[in-house]
């Protein structure tokens, strides 16, 4: 069966991708998963310099999923280019680099460094709820989202996917904003902001107090938002949020997604 998908001019062997932050750069999972079977590997967020992330504890189990506040810990663009890209190039899968930053200039620096690298697509993360600056600050304001999309597009040599947050009043307006800024595709949803209390310690389960909720509990919300975004814009949509089964993925495709990303399910035994 031919399951190839054209995503912004890039051919994927199938529409199944990993979700950023749940698969590293693929090496950790390569002993358990044949990366050649994936449509694309979406890397963990990559910044201009190494980020330490948030203090621990930063992961907690919740009903129907998990709560995390990793804070986009990553080794930085230098090590990513030196180590991770050569590893991924050994496989017959597309490479999607998730880019994170605190400021527009930091995003641009990473995008510019990747311009001459053999990667296929860029996913710009303006939707992480677990960093104090950047990310979600762009992802909740349509004007800011449009402006950073336009700024990144000036430097990008690969197609640009803008990753949207569900923590907004209107996902349709956010989708329209990044499309107006020149986005080649849109991915959604990132995690929903949540909180858990450790009743035995009488304190927050996470050091960051709040974190991002992911897993099957958010799937119906994700399906609804993918549907709304797909009906608001004319660029391809990548659907994610609580996808565990083929049926979950098909739901996303039926409401307008061109491809899907699997995230929290990667953490299951």
What residue ranges belong to the model's regions?
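Short beta->alpha connector loops at strand-helix junctions that form conserved
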Residues: 44, 241, 263-264
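Acidic-and-aromatic substrate-binding clefts and catalytic sites of carbohydrate-active enzymes
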Residues: 24-25, 105, 268
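N-terminal capping/small domains of soluble enzymes
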Residues: 1-95, 101
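Short gly/pro/ser/thr-enriched loop/turn and capping motifs at secondary-structure boundaries
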Residues: 47-52, 129-131, 193-196, 267-269
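Small/polar glycine-rich anion-binding or flexible loop at a beta-alpha turn
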Residues: 243-247, 269
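Alpha/beta enzyme core
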Residues: 31, 102-238, 247-257, 262
């Amino acid at each position: 069966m031919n399951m190839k998908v054209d995503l912004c001019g890039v051919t994927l062997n199938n529409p199944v991708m990993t979700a950023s932050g749940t698969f590293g750069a693929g090496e950790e999972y390569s002993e358990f998963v044949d990366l050649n079977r994936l449509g694309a590997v979406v890397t963990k967020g990559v910044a201009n310099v190494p980020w330490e992330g948030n203090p621990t504890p930063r992961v907690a189990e919740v009903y129907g999923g998990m709560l995390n506040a990793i804070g986009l810990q990553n080794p930085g663009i230098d090590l990513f280019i030196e180590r991770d890209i050569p590893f991924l190039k050994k496989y017959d899968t597309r490479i999607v680099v998730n880019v994170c930053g605190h400021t527009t200039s930091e995003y641009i620096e990473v995008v510019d460094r990747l311009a001459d690298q053999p990667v296929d697509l860029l996913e710009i993360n303006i939707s992480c709820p677990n960093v104090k600056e950047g990310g979600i600050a762009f992802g909740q304001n349509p004007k800011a989202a449009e402006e950073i999309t336009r700024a990144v597009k000036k430097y990008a040599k690969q197609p640009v996917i803008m990753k949207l947050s569900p923590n907004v009043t209107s996902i349709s307006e956010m989708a329209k904003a990044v499309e107006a800024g020149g986005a080649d595709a849109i991915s959604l949803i990132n995690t929903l902001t949540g909180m858990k209390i450790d009743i035995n310690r009488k304190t927050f389960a996470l050091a960051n107090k709040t974190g991002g909720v992911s897993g099957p509990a958010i799937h119906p919300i994700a399906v609804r938002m993918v549907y709304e975004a797909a009906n608001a814009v004319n660029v391809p949509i990548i659907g994610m949020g609580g996808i565990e089964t083929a049926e979950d993925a098909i739901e996303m495709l039926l409401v307008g997604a061109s491809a899907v990303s699997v995230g929290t399910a990667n953490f299951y035994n």
